[in-house]
Amino acid sequence: MFRILIANSKGGSGKTTVTTTLAGYYARAGRRTCLLDCDPQGSSLDWHRLRAPGRPPLHAIAGHDALHASSAASVLRLPRDTQVLLIDTPAGLRAHEFAPFARQADVLLVPLVPSPLDLRATLGFLDLVLRLPEVRQGRLRVNLIANRLRERSVAARELDATLQKLTQTCAIRVRDSQRYLHLAAAGLSLFDDDSAAARPHRDDWTALLNWLALREREPRSDAVAAVAAGPLCNA
């Protein structure tokens, strides 16, 4: 199972948009996909409930309480043969709260919004992330996503300058568009929209999808696989 964690301690960074977009992509690709919504607000679950029966199927689970529990009775039962697990996390996570999430994942995607206040909060979160043993030892690979970006804007230039100092680059730069809101209201993702108008938006995600495909093909040791299994198992 390939586990993708979407996290940022800053609220409003677009975690749910990233989660549902990727869920739509993997489901459309025929992968057995499960969405684990660990945010008490339940936005990803709401999106899933709105999804029309005729769309590519995917499974969704409310996981806020169980993922933080350590008892065997709290094991989350994922659908059998789940191939891709997407974990949507709540805002405001502190170090001791985020660590259990990091142990569940193969990759971490950090969405960010290019505004001074949002960037400041995200930098604090990245500092937390880069201190994790999973990241330092290469067990958890990290990439960034610039959300609601308007190219050639002052905010975009400030984002690039900040990332250059961090020696980090964004896997993708998602343009600012109302299309995501309109699709979400119908339980759809960008990859459910075959219109010509949506093609440039889908192209925004190509670099990230290629990066994820490479990460999924990377070999994982038995020890790493055991750590990642954590309180998640297949029913």
Question: What function would you assign to each model-found segment?
Answer:
Residues 3-13, 24-99, 103, 184-188:
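P-loop/Walker-type NTP enzyme "switch/lid" segment
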Residues 17-18:
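Hydrophobic positions on the alpha1 helix immediately C-terminal to the Walker A/P-loop
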Residues 96-116:
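Inter-motif core of Ras-like GTPase G domains
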Residues 120-139, 147:
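Conserved C-terminal guanine-recognition region of P-loop GTPase G domains, centered on the G4
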Residues 148-151, 160-191:
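Beta-strand-loop-alpha "switch" segments that mediate conformational coupling across diverse proteins
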Residues 182-201, 206:
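Inter-lobe coupling/hinge region of RecA-like P-loop helicase motors
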Residues 216-235:
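P-loop NTP-binding site
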